[in-house]
């Protein structure tokens, strides 16, 4: 804070949201923000009434109670929530096809899974992994208005395949080279059951047991692959990285920063894909990346409420094709998790 500053004012979309009388050079000022894009103006005022302002935006707000900045980090597999597990198993068994489910409260570690280690066609879900590797390589977020910023926006918000291929080429000189880079990054995070497999085809109780990761069925296919367990761990790592914690920060020290995580979370908050975890909107703020092909439909993301944060991953496959029942399953799993939070 500049010398001589006596007061700080914060305006959100032009509305005065907070003021602070300055008595020391360093201080914290907490300002709740809505779950939508806003512009923040921070003004410093000296004893003569002169103003100096900084404008920041757009900024997308998340509940303070869900922030990953402090407190113990639950074990990776946490513990199985018996009530939630019964619901998740029931939903998994009733789905007309094969599905893989994983859900976890990121504050308590309680969660449930169904067929979470079965490999599914990954479709567009691994585009988040492309984005993580790109920001690790760039050592920072791309400049607003730049080609890379536009490609990232189109890839994560609109799930554009051409943009994903161009970013793979940026990473490795070709889609296969970029794919190898993404695979290497995922292996470093321990995500051993996922495979980028080149670029995208362009078409128009008192005792707590760990969350179980058994395989009850898996589709037969060749190509990009992932599991509910791998995707959930990637989303969890992104959440923790926003608070300068977790595997992305520790494993890639200095190369992947909290600002990178928050940038990707901002893009995920603006995903235009329909269905799936979107059915939980109204009960939670949803940051997610969906993926689909004719026989597979998936959604994986982070759900934020005033009380906490959750990771929810739902992968579905049916040899005869998938549709609204996959979206309905994702919504039901998400709402079941929120009810237990």
Locate the predicted segments by residue:
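Active-site SXXK
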Residues: 109, 119-143, 155, 312
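Active-site-proximal loop and beta-strand segments within enzyme catalytic domains
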Residues: 136-162, 176, 180, 188
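Structured C-terminal helix/loop/strand segments within mature extracytoplasmic catalytic/sensor domains
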Residues: 2-3, 12, 29-47, 54-67, ...
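Second-shell loop/turn segments in exported
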Residues: 70-78, 113-121, 140-142, 150-154, ...
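Short beta-strand segments within Ig-like beta-sandwich modules, predominantly Fibronectin type-III
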Residues: 16-25
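Mid-domain, small-residue-enriched loop/turn segments at the edges of structured enzyme/sensor domains
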Residues: 168-247
